[in-house]
Amino acid sequence: MANKMEKMASIDAQLRQLVPAKVSEDDKLIEYDALLLDRFLDILQDLHGEDLKDSVQEVYELSAEYERKHDPKKLEELGNLITSFDAGDSIVVAKSFSHMLNLANLAEEVQIAHRRRNKLKKGDFRDESNATTESDIEETLKKLVFDMKKSPQEVFDALKNQTVDLVLTAHPTQSVRRSLLQKHGRVRNCLSQLYAKDITPDDKQELDEALQREIQAAFRTDEIKRTPPTPQDEMRAGMSYFHETIWKGVPKFLRRVDTALKNIGINERVPYNAPLIQFSSWMGGDRDGNPRVTPEVTRDVCLLARMMAANLYYSQIEDLMFELSMWRCNDELRVRAEELHRNSKKDEVAKHYIEFWKKIPLNEPYRVVLGEVRDKLYRTRERSRYLLAHGYCEIPEEATFTNVDEFLEPLELCYRSLCACGDRAIADGSLLDFLRQVSTFGLSLVRLDIRQESDRHTDVMDAITKHLEIGSYQEWSEEKRQEWLLSELIGKRPLFGPDLPQTDEIRDVLDTFRVIAELPSDNFGAYIISMATAPSDVLAVELLQRECKVRNPLRVVPLFEKLDDLESAPAALARLFSIDWYINRIDGKQEVMIGYSDSGKDAGRFSAAWQLYKAQEDLIKVAQKFGVKLTMFHGRGGTVGRGGGPTHLAILSQPPETIHGSLRVTVQGEVIEQSFGEEHLCFRTLQRFTAATLEHGMRPPSSPKPEWRALMDQMAVIATEEYRSIVFKEPRFVEYFRLATPEMEYGRMNIGSRPAKRRPSGGIETLRAIPWIFAWTQTRFHLPVWLGFGAAFRQVVQKDVKNLHMLQEMYNQWPFFRVTIDLVEMVFAKGDPGIAALNDRLLVSKDLWPFGEQLRSKYEETKKLLLQVAAHKEVLEGDPYLKQRLRLRDSYITTLNVFQAYTLKRIRDPNYKVEVRPPISKESAETSKPADELVTLNPTSEYAPGLEDTLILTMKGIAAGMQNTG
């Protein structure tokens, strides 16, 4: 036992040696990490007994030994130990490692925030030039004015006219339950406070107790979602971030922008109606491949958001009434207050209010005016609530706020009056914050985008033309479709009546348009058409909006995803802009969405990244030619394989001219928690997007040299060929993929409301991009990210050795190329082909082993060539912090990888025999009852007891360790 303790102590010492000298100053990561793990292991011993804790440490030690030498024998030893646990013990051990990875993530977040604060205190805004940190708004403004010699006024004008629209989507990549996310938040808070400078010994003791309590509560919560979420659940989960961080985070961030402006000599605040940050959502609006998003769901989600918005305003209005107790006001406000006072009943009492429930006297004019706002907010909230619960409401719509201008008007009146009476300082307090919230969130909190596949609209049009007996729309050429759609758009007659024969699918599409027509227009953002290829796709939606009587039609946004669609997108847009009717309809503004996930799945990361770059350049040229302002909407996932990566780098590496002060970008799944899970994270996210968008517009990145483009074009052809020859043309690839990864078991995690496939049968092309990336992330082989890079580098360097120098020059001088390479390098730092080899040996049929070996040799070759291009001796040598943090995690992730491989073996091969020892964990230390009660949480599993839960826990743990799922 003593020997074991020494071993554990020696691991801590090794971890300390891992830290390069440069890193160790004021670096508390290891301290935080060790504290959380100590507390957790104590809790584990208290709950499940000393034997179990020792087993967890033994497993960790074996894994750490493997990490030191990468000896495959150690993985086998680890496998033998893991398979000897009985069902209950397996679940507890897998859960322990998953839990420890979540704790490591929390320690890291607190440490990053701590280090950033320390630097800011010293007035150091610069950050290490690595991928995990970014510049803040103050530094960006100073850089533009002092280094780039821009005038402060020019910077201010650009800033107040730019817009970043963050679109929250329910992509099924958030694998941690909300119950756990909340507990994690409390652990984070305890940690932050424990390291505060002015903490007393008593505080420390109480915080330590709270920390242990939260760690235990998280460990005792079932990590596995037992039922899949509905779209309404996803919406509520997304909206909880507004409640917890975004609502208060926006005005706080805008105050920081005001301060930063003051420091470059601008003595004005950002106008409250400047659209710096906007929020949209796909939750309950994205019906692409998700049959569970029905018109009723869309209606519910909109009403729910309106109710939540009214509730948030309502909860703040009384504070504002308390604050504005002044009697001095301008004539305009006095007249309004007198009028309201006259019209209110003499002894009106409002017993449902806590404060200001009696009639407000006239010598408090601001309170009189705000009292009327409060009454209207109350009715607005109640109306949405009744409509949501009962489908009807007796409160008339005109007694509520129906548009934002109506809501802003009395608030602006108060603001003007305060300024006129010399009370600008008071006006710029809570009232300004409130005005900014109203301008940002409106009455609907977020604007809901609707997304639908273009084929579904084509089916509706086909039904209409057949019903009118003028032929089959589906069989018409693009020219004929456009001609007919335009003649209908210009004409006035209704296209169809109630006698149109409708399938369920057609009814669903038409009812969606009817819901859009029925609800207030400020509920909605864009109508996005996925798999859009031609102008008729856009015109069809315009016509359907008119037919269903949508008073303020939504802007229609084509989404281009596959490689071929991206190549033909500029031509399709030019054809659309050549239509006079359409140019008149859009008022000089168009939005185009580009998809990162499916383009990556279709051609591999290298070619997709380059094609996305070129498509944006060409789309902007088309828009400029027709005098249209184009907004690019980036559909990025969280993982590198789906376009993810650090925000500011992703923005700064976009082609010049393509952002131009307006940007829309999706924030998906687990990225929502990483961006908005905590107040400081929310602040940092808003800051990153705003600063990077401003910098990209005012200091555009350099355009690539013609010879760089030529080389990229050559390499993209090679990379696509290599990627497709394996993924689509290798006859047994799909079989290998399904055996070597947990793709077939992914659906059991219940993390999203939509199916994993667009169609139930079929190969890779029907699989959604998320499970495709998820499966490779789980085995730490990351094939979709790197496949193609190696072949491209090898062939161009073999052709001419000078190309290696050119690639190095591109890496050093061209932000887009550097970001692309750095992100793949980071993925290599997280990868381990040894784990993929173990999966092959256990799960893949022998005749496919050579194929697996061939892929692993490609992996090693790609890694070697990538390092040559970046002129690095080893992976991540330019980023010691990130390297250290990844190495702290490796042993935990490896344990879960081995657990997963052996559990899959037992699930898939009923003849696989293991020697199981007697149970060692107790249900709790006080009883001698074994922990196998955990097995009863999943009574309907079709596998041997405990296997399915163990598998899901390993998937969740690995996702936490890799810090992404799909």
Curated annotation (Swiss-Prot):
Q: What is the enzyme's main class?
A: lyase
Q: Where in the cell is it found?
A: Cytoplasm
User: According to the UniProt record, which cysteines are disulfide-bonded?
Assistant: none
- What SUPFAM superfamilies does the record tag this protein with? Phosphoenolpyruvate/pyruvate domain (SSF51621)
Q: Tell me which cofactor or cofactors this protein depends on.
A: Mg(2+)
Q: InterPro entries from the entry? A: PEP_COase, PEP_COase_bac/pln-type, PEP_COase_Lys_AS, PEPCASE_His_AS, Pyrv/PenolPyrv_kinase-like_dom
Write down any Gene Ontology CC term. apoplast
This protein's major location comes to: cytoplasm
PROSITE patterns listed in its UniProt record:
PEPCASE_1, PEPCASE_2
The GO terms this record gives for MF are: phosphoenolpyruvate carboxylase activity
Q: How is its activity regulated?
A: By light-reversible phosphorylation.
User: Does the entry feature the keyword Cytoplasm, yes or no?
Assistant: yes
* HAMAP family associated with the record: PEPcase_type1
**Role noted for this protein:** Through the carboxylation of phosphoenolpyruvate (PEP) it forms oxaloacetate, a four-carbon dicarboxylic acid source for the tricarboxylic acid cycle.
Q: This protein is called what?
A: Phosphoenolpyruvate carboxylase
Species, as recorded: Medicago sativa (Alfalfa)
State which gene encodes it: PEPC
